[in-house]
Every structure is written in structure tokens, then in C-alpha cells.
Amino acid sequence: MKRTFQPSNRKRKNKHGFRERMASANGRRVLAARRAKGRKKLTVSDEYNGQKW
């Protein structure tokens, strides 16, 4: 049986990246909460900053 987690950086960024979070009110709320908590990485996009993926 195939495992359920088949990692893909492209899908990961498209679903959980910064621009996707900013696209909806709830996503912006997620970012605000993570900022308030003092998270170093707000989104998965922060792992790549500037690199090609």
C-alpha cells in the first residue's frame, strides 16, 4: 500500500506558503497569530527565502 505522505516542495509552498496565507482573511489571522507568538518561521516559504525550489 502506498504511503499517504508523498512530499512535494511545490505543492507545499502553494498550499501553505506566504502568498496563500495572505490570500484569505483566515490565512492572515494565522500569520497574525504566529507573529504574536514570536515564531521565527511564519510560513513554509520562510525556509526557502530566495532559493529556487
UniProtKB/Swiss-Prot annotation:
<protein>
    <recommendedName>
        <fullName>Large ribosomal subunit protein bL34</fullName>
    </recommendedName>
</protein>
<comment type="similarity">
    <text>Belongs to the bacterial ribosomal protein bL34 family.</text>
</comment>
<dbReference type="InterPro" id="IPR000271">
    <property type="entry name" value="Ribosomal_bL34"/>
</dbReference>
<feature type="region of interest" description="Disordered">
    <location>
        <begin position="1"/>
        <end position="53"/>
    </location>
</feature>
<dbReference type="Pfam" id="PF00468">
    <property type="entry name" value="Ribosomal_L34"/>
</dbReference>
<dbReference type="GO" id="GO:0005840">
    <property type="term" value="C:ribosome"/>
</dbReference>
<keyword id="KW-0689">Ribosomal protein</keyword>
<keyword id="KW-0687">Ribonucleoprotein</keyword>
<feature type="compositionally biased region" description="Basic residues">
    <location>
        <begin position="1"/>
        <end position="16"/>
    </location>
</feature>
<dbReference type="GO" id="GO:1990904">
    <property type="term" value="C:ribonucleoprotein complex"/>
</dbReference>
<dbReference type="GO" id="GO:0003735">
    <property type="term" value="F:structural constituent of ribosome"/>
</dbReference>
<dbReference type="GO" id="GO:0006412">
    <property type="term" value="P:translation"/>
</dbReference>
<dbReference type="InterPro" id="IPR020939">
    <property type="entry name" value="Ribosomal_bL34_CS"/>
</dbReference>
<feature type="compositionally biased region" description="Basic residues">
    <location>
        <begin position="31"/>
        <end position="42"/>
    </location>
</feature>
